[in-house]
């Protein structure tokens, strides 16, 4: 979720974080359908570090450049195969689907924040799986079974 704290507007889409060199390097390149926001956390707040390229991008995106206090220093509608440098130094870059800047009514000077939803794994954790193991057969073989509920008198 992206929040324009200055204007009280909220975009409820998914947000992912790019906080390592490889995540920042990959970015949204070759992503066929950008349907989430990607927040880049940069090592320093400079114009050079915050410059982006749109090589190998399959579609246009909205880009919000923020300083270390999360205030907007520049906004761009970025098109494929272009290079962009923000007007001021940026510590954070938010790449979003086209239209999010308009939806948030974002302008230079606005404070933008975000919340990242915890990604859930489709694979159960080992602890959950162990709770389901029980001895079911009289011959001692182990099989998957729901644990027997304890009665009050036990």
Swiss-Prot record:
Pfam family, one: DUF192
Annotated InterPro entries: DUF192, Saro_0823-like_sf, UPF0127
Family named by the database record: Belongs to the UPF0127 family.
Record HAMAP family: UPF0127 (MF_00263)
Name used for this protein in its record: UPF0127 protein TSIB_1463
Protein origin, superkingdom: Archaea
Natural source organism: Thermococcus sibiricus (strain DSM 12597 / MM 739)
């Amino acid at each position: 979720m992206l929040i324009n704290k200055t204007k009280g507007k909220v975009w409820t889409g998914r947000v992912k974080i790019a906080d390592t060199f490889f995540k920042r390097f990959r970015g949204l390149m070759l992503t066929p359908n950008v349907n989430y926001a990607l927040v880049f956390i940069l090592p320093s707040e400079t114009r050079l570090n915050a410059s982006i390229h749109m090589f190998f991008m399959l579609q246009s995106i909205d880009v919000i450049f923020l300083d270390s206090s999360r205030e907007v220093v520049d906004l761009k509608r970025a098109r494929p195969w272009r290079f962009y440098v923000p007007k001021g130094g940026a510590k954070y870059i938010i790449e979003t689907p086209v239209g999010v800047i308009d939806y948030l009514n974002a302008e230079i000077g606005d404070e933008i924040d975000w919340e990242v939803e915890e990604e859930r794994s489709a694979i159960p954790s080992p602890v959950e799986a162990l709770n389901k193991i029980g001895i079911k057969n009289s011959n001692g073989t182990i099989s998957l079974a729901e644990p027997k509920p304890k009665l009050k008198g036990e």
